[in-house]
Amino acid sequence: SNKGGLTGIPTGYRGLDDITSGWQPSDLVIIAGRPAMGKTSFALSIAKNVAVDYHIPIGFFSLEMNNVQLVNRLISNVCEISGHKILNGQLDNTEWERLDRKLRDLTGAPIYVDDTPGLSVFELRTKARRLVREKGVKLLMIDYLQLMNANGMKFGSRQEEVSTISRSLKGLAKELNIPVLALSQLSRNVENREGLEGKRPQLSDLRESGAIEQDA
């Protein structure tokens, strides 16, 4: 259904949605950054907005964190409480009440997490098809692209393998007719450039493959 005039899946971030009109069917969307710059946190915030606020089913493939770690991060995001405080139970009465209230919102939210380590792009395609067929998933999220592999194929370099993965994800988005969001690492080049403008990421900074900027 149309969400606030958007034609695609809303992110919950008005400025971004105004620019994109939501993520469109068959889109491959890349969220890129250097390590520890908040890519996963941003993706989880979007996941919360999509699944909890809009009740749109999503599939989240986490190659970096296991299921427990990811759920803890999601709870922290939804409740706006430090994950460390939640893990240690160091909450005041107001925070306990907020945790209880927000967990009720989160319980039953259509978020389907797969934390299979070392997932190949071919395994992901099989799992994604099943999620769309059985759960009605409308958005796939992958954390993160460079942790995937293309087992069963031979490549002259890692760059060629990542290019194949990127093209496969774009093909999957088109086949399933849903947006696929993949997190991606940036190369060190962005850190080696001088000045504020020099630190601004460029498409050429996408790590291990120039194909990502063409497919997304």
Predicted regions and their residues:
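N-terminal pre-Walker A segment at the start of P-loop NTPase domains
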Residues: S1-D18
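Flexible beta-alpha connector loops of hexameric P-loop NTPases
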Residues: G4-G5, G83-N93, I111-G118, N149-S163, ...
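Cytosolic-facing regulatory segments adjacent to core modules
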Residues: D18, N49-G136, A150
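Pre-Walker A (Motif I) flank of P-loop NTPase domains
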Residues: Q24-V29, I56
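The conserved Walker
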Residues: P35
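Conserved lysine of the Walker
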Residues: K39-T40
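Phosphate-binding/switch region of NTP-binding enzymes
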Residues: E160-A216
